[in-house]
């Protein structure tokens, strides 16, 4: 069985954030195939990201959808996992996954991801501390 994670974010490609996520996935299981849906979602634009995922979910292989578009990244908001007939969707609990989930028939179960063993610490982590060019633009 193919192990596939389809990945979308608003990270952009100008820093190492996408590479860090893909590297962590690869360290956990080097046999996982990662499909990049988009990393050019406008920063923190949940509506845009949600519409993009709704359209994409119809064409990408079943498996895992990992999506990150979150104005509160690094906050106390917990990431969630949603089990569907299509597979599992992982992302912030901010509505980003709602349209994609509805498109594939709705949620069977949803869980807050709270196991600290699977969460990258914020201190010194590129995903939380490295400014991107869009953050530095005047």
Which residues does each predicted region cover?
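Short, glycine/acidic-enriched loop or turn micro-motifs at the edges of active sites
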Residues: 13, 73, 135
């Amino acid at each position: 069985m193919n192990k596939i994670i389809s990945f979308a974010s608003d990270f952009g490609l100008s820093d190492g954030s996408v590479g860090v996520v893909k590297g962590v996935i690869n360290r956990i299981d080097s046999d996982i195939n990662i499909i990049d849906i988009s990393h050019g979602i406008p920063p923190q634009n949940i509506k845009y990201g949600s519409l993009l995922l709704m359209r994409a979910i119809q064409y990408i292989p079943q498996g895992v959808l990992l999506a990150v578009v979150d104005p509160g990244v690094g906050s106390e908001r917990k990431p969630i996992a949603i089990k569907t007939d299509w597979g599992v969707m992982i992302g912030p609990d901010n509505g980003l996954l709602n349209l994609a989930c509805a498109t594939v028939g709705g949620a069977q179960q949803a869980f807050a991801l709270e196991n600290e063993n699977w969460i990258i610490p914020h201190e010194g982590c590129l995903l939380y501390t490295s400014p991107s060019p869009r953050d530095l633009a005047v």
